[in-house]
């Protein structure tokens, strides 16, 4: 994870209208977010008080704000199930000193406020790219819930945030020293769940296996680090609080141990045998596919990333096993969601659209299913599909408008024409992108 510097704001916005005025989007081409969605032309959508209030052929009153979309494509805002708000995905060719940076970031009230502002800037970067809801699954102390609360109270603009705050891990485990706190014992881990409940988190995040960079030898990515008794104790305590548990898992053994001991959401994943398939179904667990951070590590020139041959070898294992796991899950009726693991090198808050493309291309789903997965399906995973995720009367006005049809080419989403979040309209948002990041990633868009 990297803490990139920002040049002023990484976005610019024009606010067209506020939350309470009735606004009618005339003449749009509607993609409603449902599984079998197809483009519907010449549709009007009305929003008022942050909600969608009418869909169809609408006659405006004299007091209504009317925006003629002239056939542009209107769809639900994207939902990213896996982000890390303290980092922006800046290209790098050497490891960051994340432990030292984290100590500095949390060392004083002033530094914490600066990091909070940075997290907000990254959240806004995602919003300007059409991501209206994020699930933050590993941050610095309680900064993610603080940012969530400021946005929810109206003090700041921003996407809807469901926050886990810091992740729970084990000594020498994945991301310890930055977004993960190590638990020495089962009792320590349970106390951390209690602490997180006190911070009013929306879910708990566990780091159960190592990651690619943690592997010490070739062929050993995703080594199981957290023992079953700790996993079960954390899940039992979290479930007692009504909180779901997401877990970083990058090996078959890790998937099995996590799901069988109560984890609700497997982040990244790996290949699945019948035992894991049965466990997913028994426990109603879901898999969150995150191809975005794996592709650069597996496919880029090693010199571009500054990684060893062993790291790239392990990255390829993770990359292909994650794709195979997602395919197997879908074939067996297991729910698969989408996230980006934003914060990893070359994985930015503004590139959720690329994850949809990777999902279509590598997992073999249709473009409509990919868009459904990133909208209504992701909302179902979060338990907020009654609030957002599709264009339906009564739901929040979380909307993305593109100039062309994303079902023909997901690059249509790379620069939205308009974004609406809980009724607030942002027209022609501009995003400051990392040129090197876009240059390298575009090589693998086909």
Predicted features and spans:
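Short, Lys/Arg-enriched N-terminal segments with co-localized hydrophobic residues
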Residues: 5-20
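Active-site microenvironment of metallo-dependent hydrolases
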Residues: 16-43, 48, 58, 105-106, ...
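Active-site metal-binding motif and surrounding structural segment of the metallo-beta-lactamase
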Residues: 58-75
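Metal-associated gating/positioning segment near the N- to mid-region
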Residues: 73-150, 229
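Active-site mouth loops of central-metabolism enzymes
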Residues: 104-117, 174-191
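Divalent metal-dependent hydrolysis catalytic cores, especially in the metallo-beta-lactamase
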Residues: 108-112, 119-144, 158-169, 201-215, ...
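Active-site core of metal-dependent hydrolases
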Residues: 210-323, 337, 342-344, 364-365, ...
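His/Asp/Glu-enriched, well-ordered alpha-helical/loop segment
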Residues: 240, 307-310, 319-405
């Amino acid at each position: 994870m990297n803490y990139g510097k920002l040049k002023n704001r990484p976005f610019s916005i024009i606010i067209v209208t506020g939350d309470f005025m009735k606004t009618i989007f005339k003449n749009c081409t509607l993609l409603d977010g449902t599984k079998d969605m197809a483009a519907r032309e010449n549709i009007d959508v009305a929003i008022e008080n942050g909600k969608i209030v009418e869909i169809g052929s609408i006659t405006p009153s004299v007091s209504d704000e009317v925006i003629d979309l002239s056939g542009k494509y209107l769809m639900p805002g994207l939902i990213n199930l896996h982000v890390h708000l303290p980092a922006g995905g800046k290209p790098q060719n050497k490891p960051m000193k994340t432990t030292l940076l984290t100590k500095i970031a949390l060392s004083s009230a002033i530094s914490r406020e600066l990091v909070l502002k940075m997290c907000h800037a990254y959240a806004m970067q995602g919003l300007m790219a059409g991501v209206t809801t994020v699930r933050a699954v590993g941050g610095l102390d309680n900064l993610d819930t603080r940012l969530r609360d400021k946005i929810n109270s109206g003090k700041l603009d921003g996407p809807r945030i469901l926050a886990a705050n810091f992740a729970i891990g084990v000594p020498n485990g994945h991301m310890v020293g930055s977004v993960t706190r190590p638990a020495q014992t089962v009792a320590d881990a349970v106390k951390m769940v209690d602490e997180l409940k006190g911070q009013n988190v929306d879910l708990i995040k566990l780091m159960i296996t190592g990651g690619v960079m943690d592997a010490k030898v070739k062929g050993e990515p995703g080594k199981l680090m957290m023992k079953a008794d700790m996993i079960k104790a954390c899940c039992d305590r979290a479930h007692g609080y009504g909180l779901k548990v997401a877990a970083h898992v990058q090996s078959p053994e890790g998937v099995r141990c996590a799901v069988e001991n109560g984890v609700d959401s497997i982040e990244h994943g790996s290949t699945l045998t019948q035992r894991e398939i049965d466990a997913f179904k028994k426990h109603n667990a879901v898999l969150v596919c995150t191809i975005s951070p794996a592709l650069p590590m597996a496919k880029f020139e090693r010199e571009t990333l500054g990684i060893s041959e062993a790291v790239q070898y392990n990255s390829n294992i993770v990359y292909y096993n994650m794709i195979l796991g997602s395919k197997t899950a879908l074939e067996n009726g297991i729910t698969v969601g989408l996230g980006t693991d934003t914060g990893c090198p070359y994985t930015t808050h503004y590139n959720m659209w690329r994850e949809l493309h990777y999902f279509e291309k590598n997992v073999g789903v249709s473009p409509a299913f990919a868009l459904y997965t990133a909208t209504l399906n992701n909302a179902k995973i979060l338990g907020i599909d009654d609030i957002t995720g599709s264009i339906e009367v009564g739901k929040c006005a979380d909307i993305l408008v593109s100039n062309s049809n994303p079902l023909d080419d997901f690059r249509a989403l790379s620069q939205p024409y308009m974004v609406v979040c809980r009724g607030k309209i942002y027209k022609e948002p501009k995003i400051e992108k990392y040129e090197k990041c876009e240059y390298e990633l575009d090589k693998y868009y086909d």
